Amino acid sequence: MAPDPDPVTKPTRATGPASVWYEAVMWVAMNAAERDEFLAGVHVGVLSAAIGTAGHTLAVPVWYSYQPGGLLTVLTGRRSRKAAAMRAAGRFGLCVQDASPPYRYVSVEGPVVREEELDPVERLAMARRYLGAAGGNRYVADNPDLGRENVAFRMRPEHWLSQDQGRQAQG
């Protein structure tokens, strides 16, 4: 019987680019500074919030903004299912990820501390964050009712989960 191939190139059930290194990596939790920096980066977040009392959960992609150590902000339609769920539950979660190897993610959950209109400067900054300067400017100009139709939910992060598959565990 032939010896096992090198663990880095050993065939796995994984497909795509991860199959080469899949078994040679470890999931390592990020420290507070790393998770803050990652969450502050530009990612589409997946917001989750409880719907009703039957244990159902709403999970939808959203734009968000976050400054390390501060509140996390999501912008949504004032009458949307997301807004209704966050109001009713009084809290929500958000997960962001890097979908390219080595994989990383940060998941955060906490209470809604404020619901308010997003001022025009912050609304433009969020549009530029996701669409670039020209695209953000055009998006805001083409949607003059954003200020009346949307609302910002601010969350204070309480519970964090994070993993970085590109780091080795410190032993």
Which residues does each PLM region occupy?
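Extreme N-terminal basic, low-complexity initiation segments
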Residues: M1-P5
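Charged, gly/pro-rich active-site loop segments
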Residues: D6-A29, R104-G171
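Short, basic/aromatic recognition patches
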Residues: W21-V46
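A generic secondary-structure signal marking the coil-to-beta-strand transition
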Residues: R35, H43, G70, R104, ...
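Short beta-strand segments
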Residues: V42-R78, M86, F92-V96, Y105-V108
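Short, solvent-exposed aromatic-acidic interface loops
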Residues: G77-R81, Y130
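Short, surface-exposed beta-strand-loop junctions and turns on beta-sheet-rich folds
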Residues: S80-K82, P101, A169-Q170
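Short secondary-structure boundary segments
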Residues: D98-A99, P157
